[in-house]
């Protein structure tokens, strides 16, 4: 879970300035992050649950990602796993996130109002703290188009805040 995004000039979420106040998380929507065990993504696995069909494993939203898709020139050993363990993020702007105690902007069905104004985040400490001396030069990020089936859908924004 991330802290509320904060900018000194033109803040998108003014509640970020509130310390020890329940309003601090009022625009936080639900963000799920997870990895899928390779047992569920291998077509030839005898341990795969029966309800997962080969069609399920071919669907872009549920299939495994092979090393060759992301790193086409990487040589894998004979005992290496060919499926890349990826961090999956799923954002639900209509659903209340953790510590969101906002009671005013909620629809009668319990979903959040103004989903376009909501945010979700995840944060992690990066070691070491001096990225320049550690020779960290870029972030590599692979994004699956969430609108594969609906090209008319309006998207959101993705931000990376490196501190």
How does the language model describe each region?
Residues 1-163:
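Surface-exposed, low-hydrophobicity segments enriched in Gly/Pro/acidic/Ser residues
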């Amino acid at each position: 879970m991330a802290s509320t995004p904060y900018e000194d000039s033109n803040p998108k979420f003014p509640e970020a300035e509130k310390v020890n106040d329940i309003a601090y998380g009022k625009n936080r929507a639900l963000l799920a992050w997870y990895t899928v065990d390779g047992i569920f993504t291998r077509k030839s696995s005898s341990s795969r649950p029966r309800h997962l069909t080969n069609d399920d494993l071919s669907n872009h939203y549920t299939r495994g990602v092979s090393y060759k898709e992301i790193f086409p020139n990487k040589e894998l050993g004979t005992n290496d796993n060919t499926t890349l363990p990826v961090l999956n993020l799923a954002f639900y702007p209509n659903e209340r996130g953790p510590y969101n105690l906002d009671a005013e902007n909620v629809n009668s069905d319990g979903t959040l109002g103004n989903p376009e104004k909501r945010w979700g985040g995840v944060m992690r400490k990066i070691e070491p703290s001096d990225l320049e001396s550690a020779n960290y030069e870029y972030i590599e990020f692979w994004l699956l188009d969430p609108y594969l089936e609906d090209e008319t859908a309006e998207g959101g924004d993705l931000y990376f805040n490196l501190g």
